[in-house]
Amino acid sequence: MSPSSQFTRRHILRSLPAIVTASGVMAQPNKPTIRVRALNHMTLFVSDPKRSLEFYQGLFGMPIQARQGDSGGLLRIGTGPQYLALAAAGPNRKPGIDHFCMTVDGFNPGQTLKILAAHGVTQSDAPGPMKAWTRMRGDTVEFHLGDPDGILVQLQDTSYCGGTGQLGNQCFATPEPSPRKGLIAVRDLSHFTLSVSDANRSRAFYREVFGMRIQAYQGPSSPVLAVGMGPQFLALGRGGAATPGIAHACMTMEGFNPDRVLKTLADFGIKPRGEARGPASPLVSYVNTRMEDRGGAKSGTPELYFTDPDGIVMQLQDVTYCGGAGSLGEVCL
């Protein structure tokens, strides 16, 4: 083991007690938890739904597995039921990732409310931090809550596909095919990175409420939290009190090769960002190499990002990616 490896490991081990204490898992062992199983979907608010639909179907060849009202359709990721939804941003809402959804076995809204109440989340008629609310979409109950920063989280049954029926699990028997084959076949959701005002507080919330274990470290005090049995996860980063939100989403593909993916993106019109600084502009790509001090491989773990027509940041990684070390980020705890 190299000196830098020993240094990183030593600092991670020293950080463990503080992280566990901040999580509250040891301090509050008797509170019930909501055991989430998987990431289900994300909803993007976009300035031009037709343009975004053409973009995501053109790049990924995503079929439509269901429709909700006037939306452009729910774009299936892999074999489903996971999906990407598009909605018009409107004059008072900026484009971005509005919310993400996780699934629960035997979803029961009433029982979920009781568990959340034990953690200080109160039932409400309106969104807000530490609030929970439901809405009826036809005969489908859709459950939402706000985390400590008010970031929107949806909870549904594991069978939920955004369709009809009490559980929202009745989708098209045959999805509407994409008009374009697509250049990259995405297989699943990997993770969401949340920009939060207080990482310790948010980490405590997600670990206590959902029983999430630490799956990997991206730095001594930056654990990522497993969703279900992994490799899916949530990552938390401090973005300042004025900027809580969902910073980016990640999807996976087979045979991930950064150079080939960058070329494919360029052929589609998503050009390399180069040396530009600050927030990425629309339709650019870039690779960040996560080194050993941030839990990456000794030679670096490449992490590939691109932006859509609204500048919404997306990440692409291998299907084995778990946010850990290794050349594919596939080595986790």
Where are these regions (language model features)?
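Vicinal oxygen chelate
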Residues: 3-32, 38-48, 75-76, 89-185, 262-333, ...
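Short loop/beta submotifs within extracellular cysteine-rich repeat domains
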Residues: 52, 63-64, 82-85, 93-94, ...
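Short, flexible, solvent-exposed loop/turn segments with mixed acidic/basic and small polar residues
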Residues: 32-33, 88-92, 180-183, 237-241
